[in-house]
Swiss-Prot record:
GO terms for molecular function: rRNA binding; structural constituent of ribosome. HAMAP family: Ribosomal_uL24_B. GO terms for cellular component: ribonucleoprotein complex; ribosome. Part of the 50S ribosomal subunit. GO terms for biological process: translation. This is Large ribosomal subunit protein uL24. One of two assembly initiator proteins, it binds directly to the 5'-end of the 23S rRNA, where it nucleates assembly of the 50S subunit. One of the proteins that surrounds the polypeptide exit tunnel on the outside of the subunit.
């Protein structure tokens, strides 16, 4: 799937592809991709395919009622908008500065943000060699947030070692 979260897409198929304004002009619905489900091959687009969900009052949501939320639509029903021409376009992949990026096939403009060039294997090995000798070990976030453990005083437990001797009578 060539779509990523945050892309601006237009609905090209399905029942929710057009919006009609006050003058009666049909325009295709567009929106930003909020979530992607790669298993089901669906996307959730902001402002598209809005459904009404009846919600019961819960402890987190004191008031119940009818809530409008966007429902997923199939990824084949949307196309990415070309940032230059503002029309639906297909996506291609190419390598720029050693990094694989997506580009719009209509205008040729790169869709991904400018990424840092990929480091060569020699640079990675050199960096690993210098970082291991110069810098101390990294402290993880969990280690920073961990509270020190208080020492617990050990209490001596006295054992009852006195054994009553039985008398001659056996009592």
């Amino acid at each position: 799937m060539n779509i990523k979260t945050g892309d601006t897409v237009v609905v090209i198929a399905g029942g929710d592809q057009f919006a009609v304004d006050k003058k009666g002009v049909k325009t295709r619905k567009t929106g930003r991709v909020l979530k992607i489900d790669r298993v089901k091959n669906t996307v959730i687009v902001e402002g598209v395919n809005i459904v009404k969900k009846h919600q019961r009052p819960t402890s987190a949501n004191d008031k119940g009622g009818i809530v409008e939320i966007p429902a997923p639509i199939h990824a084949s029903n949307v196309a990415i908008l070309d940032p230059k021409t503002n029309t639906p376009t297909r996506i291609g992949h190419r390598i720029e500065n050693g990094v694989k990026v997506r580009y719009a096939k209509k205008s040729g403009q790169t869709l991904d943000k400018a990424a840092k060039p990929a480091k060569t294997k020699a640079e990675k090995v050199e960096k690993a060699a210098t970082s291991s000798t110069d810098k101390p070990a990294k402290v993880t976030k969990a280690a920073k947030e961990a509270k020190p453990v208080k020492a617990v005083k050990s209490q001596k437990v006295e054992k009852n070692t006195s054994v009553q001797k039985k008398g001659a009578s056996g009592k």
